[in-house]
Amino acid sequence: MNKENPTSSEEVLRFRYKNYKGEISDRSVIPIRTIVKKSQYHNEGKPCWIMVAYDLDKEEKRDFALQDIIKYYGII
């Protein structure tokens, strides 16, 4: 996979997500990797599991805290 320019042939994961502002939305992403790291936006700055993924709606690479995924819709 080209991480900077994912293609439509990649598997897309859909889920409902609550961001650090408390806003809830459905997201469509192409997962890149899962890591543990500190983030000012997640888990009060303590280390947590993060999915790094290409967000298809925002057209950029984003970090998603796994603990903030509310519901998985599956792979589409």
Labelled PLM ranges:
Residues 1-76:
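Core beta-strand-centered patch of the WYL/Sm-like small regulatory domain
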